[in-house]
Amino acid sequence: MCRSPVFENLKHGTSHGIRFAIFDYQIVLSKFGTFCQTVVWLHWRGANLPDFAIGPGSWLGQNLLDLLTGRNDFHFESHPTFSKNHQIRGGNVSAIRELFTEDVLNFYEQHPGLSTEVSGNRLLYFRVKVRVEPDDIQSLLNEALQLLRLFQPANDEGSA
């Protein structure tokens, strides 16, 4: 059973031409408990990234991830720590693998507990069950924007 989600403390605007919203999100999932977290939502024109979700290895459990995003899992031999600590789910394996450059893999290793959901030109950035204090909101937004820049192809940086 899932109760209706609650959105609070909404802040929105534009940064470097990218629309954003930051909000506290709470949802109750009977099997998994209550999740309260601060989420950054980014929307940038011109991007067309594949649909995928990434989170810590224990993030919501294998079955829910499979249900939401497909069964494919990804492992990167060059980054065994990343592969051990993160699950990526999505359908377009080759397109998703292309996104996970050395810089992207290093970013996730340096930001433990990070969860991201991407679809086309939208990105959600959060840590499960972590609410961010008001003084740390700008830092969270900057992290999300940094990751977005890493996902953008080098020849497409101007379309943000």
Name the predicted role of every residue range.
Residues 1-39, 43-160:
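Charged, low-complexity intrinsically disordered regions
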